[in-house]
């Protein structure tokens, strides 16, 4: 299963809200349809969101039928619409900046067709970069996995969260392919259940041993000595190493620290935002209260009960053992070493 696939004039998006019960695709032919798919979490995961937004930007140009002189204003509207879909995942904004830069490079173009072709090529380049980067993350991350390891992960940072292969799950895949005996504990990840619905499905499809657990079981597993390593993905990493990821990640980091268990973040360098000094400056998306009051349309709480439903939390850098990127593994002091790595790249 691929999270998304370019079809030449539309974007084929796997509707992940229906997994694992049903495999259904959306054929997005306009940038608005891509934006809706991102908002509804039909496509999710920071790298996949970035790639989807890039294709959405290209579709904005493909769908434009006005004069060449008016394209720039139209594309500003397209970019704004896509940028407002998910505020926390920095890959979204990184991809849109790349697309905007490619559009500016076409200032001497005489035909709309030439510009459209260039934008599609840039979107495909972003997608291909993600495929390559995820393999490198897996290769570097394999070094931290012992010959036999029980690994805890949270949410879904696999192929379904990227264009291909995955970040946190990419490390696990690489370890398995290297002949290591890995067993994964996947937290269910309330309220959207990405761990239960997506991570468990991915790992089972790849014949990687996996056990699904309730989110509130993680501490007990660690206490029993059943966890050797925690690996999670990321939606935005601040300049000091503070990391925004799916709600519940911070709790796992605190538990891992208390039990002396290594806690790693796996993410591409496009997830690192050096313009954000610390986690306090990362915008945190709040989702619809219905996601907590209901489970798949079934009411599980009083309909009027107040709800606080942030989609992400921030794990302080001091709780992170290392950040696995395509450039290698970065360790503390992050404010120094992240900058060094980004300058080199």
UniProtKB/Swiss-Prot annotation:
- Which residues are the active-site ones? 235
**Site residues (Transition state stabilizer), renumbered to this chain:** 155
Kind of enzyme, top EC level?
isomerase
Q: What is its EC number?
A: 5.3.1.23
So, what pathway does this thing act in?
Amino-acid biosynthesis; L-methionine biosynthesis via salvage pathway; L-methionine from S-methyl-5-thio-alpha-D-ribose 1-phosphate: step 1/6
- What GO MF annotations does this protein's record show? S-methyl-5-thioribose-1-phosphate isomerase activity
Q: Which residues does substrate bind?
A: 44-46, 86, 194, 245-246
The record's section on SUPFAM superfamilies has:
NagB/RpiA/CoA transferase-like
What biological-process terms (Gene Ontology) are attached? L-methionine salvage from methylthioadenosine
The UniProt keywords, alphabetically, are:
Amino-acid biosynthesis, Isomerase, Methionine biosynthesis
Name the reaction it catalyses: 5-(methylsulfanyl)-alpha-D-ribose 1-phosphate = 5-(methylsulfanyl)-D-ribulose 1-phosphate
Supply the Pfam families for this chain.
IF-2B (PF01008)
UniProt record similarity statement? Belongs to the eIF-2B alpha/beta/delta subunits family. MtnA subfamily.
Which NCBIfam families does this UniProt record tie to the protein?
eIF-2B_rel, PRK05720.1, salvage_mtnA
Role description: Catalyzes the interconversion of methylthioribose-1-phosphate (MTR-1-P) into methylthioribulose-1-phosphate (MTRu-1-P).
Q: What is this protein called?
A: Methylthioribose-1-phosphate isomerase
Provide the species name. Desulfitobacterium hafniense (strain Y51)
**What gene is this protein translated from?**
mtnA
């Amino acid at each position: 299963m691929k999270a998304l696939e370019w079809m030449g004039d539309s974007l084929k998006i796997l509707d992940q809200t229906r997994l694992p019960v049903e495999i259904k695709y959306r054929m997005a032919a306009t940038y608005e349809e891509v934006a809706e798919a991102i908002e509804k979490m039909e496509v999710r995961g920071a790298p996949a969101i970035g790639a989807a937004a890039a294709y959405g930007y290209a579709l904005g140009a493909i769908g434009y039928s006005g004069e060449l002189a008016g394209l720039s204003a139209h594309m500003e509207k397209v970019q704004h619409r896509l940028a407002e879909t998910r505020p926390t995942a920095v890959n979204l904004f990184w991809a849109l900046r790349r697309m905007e830069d490619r559009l500016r490079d076409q200032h001497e173009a005489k035909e709309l067709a030439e510009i459209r072709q260039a934008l599609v090529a840039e979107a495909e380049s972003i997608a291909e970069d993600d495929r390559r980067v995820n393999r490198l993350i897996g290769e570097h991350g394999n070094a931290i996995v012992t010959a036999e390891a029980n690994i805890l992960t949270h949410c879904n940072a696999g192929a379904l969260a990227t264009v291909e292969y995955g970040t946190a799950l990419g490390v696990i895949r690489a370890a398995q392919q290297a002949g290591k005996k890995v067993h994964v504990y996947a937290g269910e990840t309330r309220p959207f259940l990405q761990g239960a619905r997506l991570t468990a499905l991915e790992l089972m499809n790849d014949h990687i041993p996996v056990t699904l657990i309730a989110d509130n079981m993680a501490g007990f597993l660690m206490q029993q000595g059943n966890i050797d390593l925690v690996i999670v993905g990321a939606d935005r990493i601040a300049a000091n190493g503070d990391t925004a990821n799916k709600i519940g990640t911070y709790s796992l980091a605190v538990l891992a620290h208390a039990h002396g268990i290594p806690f790693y973040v796996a993410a591409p360098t496009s997830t690192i935002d050096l313009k954000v000094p610390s986690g306090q400056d990362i915008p945190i998306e709040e989702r619809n209260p219905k996601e907590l009051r209901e489970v798949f349309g079934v009411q599980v709480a009083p309909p009027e009960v107040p709800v606080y439903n942030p989609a992400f939390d921030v794990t302080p850098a001091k709780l992170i053992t290392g950040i696995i990127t395509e450039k290698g593994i970065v360790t503390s002091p992050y404010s120094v070493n992240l900058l060094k790595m980004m300058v080199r790249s």
